[in-house]
Design a protein with these regions (language model features):
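Active-site hotspot residues in diverse enzymes, especially metal/ion-binding acidic/histidine motifs
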Residues: 1-273
Length: 273
């Protein structure tokens, strides 16, 4: 099947991406934001009544098309992490790279491309080897040795996986099916009882003192303060627009930053005084 062929080359595509960075830990977690910021302009802003966790778009900036990604920081950090990985897949053109590697002329429908990008994000954030290893370690930590366990104990393991990889419940549920840790039937059972399970997830997440549900409400675009300073000094925007940007992104004036201080630095790197 074409789907199986596409899935089979995702690890190779991920390795191509990782080769651009010095990533010691295969578990990327919230380092994904820094990686995304190297590939596009990222806007972090909370929209509390918006269901969407984020999106990718392109805009012309000085006659050049630039990639923009919006991350809704009103969502829990775990959802922000997976959204960042998903949107990185769009920015990096993962679907085209995958189709190129399997040498096919098929065109993906929008839903199929989203499904493929979700799989890329899952494999990027939850590499199979590490995901399986931690699953069995977490089972051992809870002294679970039998294949037949109470659903309460199994949800505890899922929450531990969520915390290890900093991803939401649904991502872990799907990944467990993808890595053959649970069957399709068990995956459907977990999906069917989602409201009951989400209550358990929330309770166990608090019990483990995780940050999975933390809502950052961050308002920024990396480098925005320096850009605003340049615009202000060069009078490149009218006062009203400039004030609105500062207000929308909570940019306060910092006094005393022009003060010169005399610092004493010890021996230099080459040993000279």
């Amino acid at each position: 099947m074409e789907w199986d062929r596409m899935i089979s080359v995702i690890p190779e595509v991920i390795q191509d991406l990782k080769s651009e960075y010095t990533l010691i830990n295969p578990m990327i977690r919230d380092d994904i934001f820094g990686i995304l910021e190297k590939h596009c302009i990222v806007v972090y802003y909370p929209l509390f009544n918006e269901k969407n966790c984020g999106f990718h778009t392109k805009r012309f900036i000085k006659d050049k098309r630039e990639d923009f990604v919006y991350i809704n920081t009103a969502k829990p950090i775990a959802e922000q992490v997976f959204t960042a990985a998903h949107e990185l897949g769009h920015v990096w053109g993962v679907a085209d790279k995958i189709l190129s590697k399997i040498d096919t002329n098929i065109r993906l429908e929008c839903d199929d491309e989203e499904k493929l990008i979700n799989r890329f994000a899952a494999e990027l954030l939850m590499p199979e080897k590490e995901f399986r290893n931690l699953f069995f370690l977490n089972m051992k930590e809870l002294s679970i040795v039998d294949n037949k366990i109470k659903i309460e104990d199994f949800i505890r393991v899922i929450v531990m996986q969520m915390n290890d990889f900093m991803v939401p419940y649904e991502s872990v549920r799907r990944r467990m099916v993808e890595t053959s840790l649970i069957t399709e039937e068990v995956g459907k059972l977990l999906d069917k009882n989602v409201e009951f399970i989400q209550a358990l997830v929330s309770a166990f997440s608090k019990d483990l003192n995780t940050i999975l549900d933390n809502v950052t409400e961050k308002k920024t675009i990396p480098g925005l303060r320096a850009l605003v300073d340049q615009i202000e000094q060069g009078k490149l925007l009218d006062e009203y627009t400039l004030c609105k940007v500062k207000k929308d992104f909570d940019i306060d004036s910092i006094l005393g930053t022009d003060t010169i201080i005399d610092i004493k630095i010890g021996d230099s790197a080459d040993g000279e005084d």
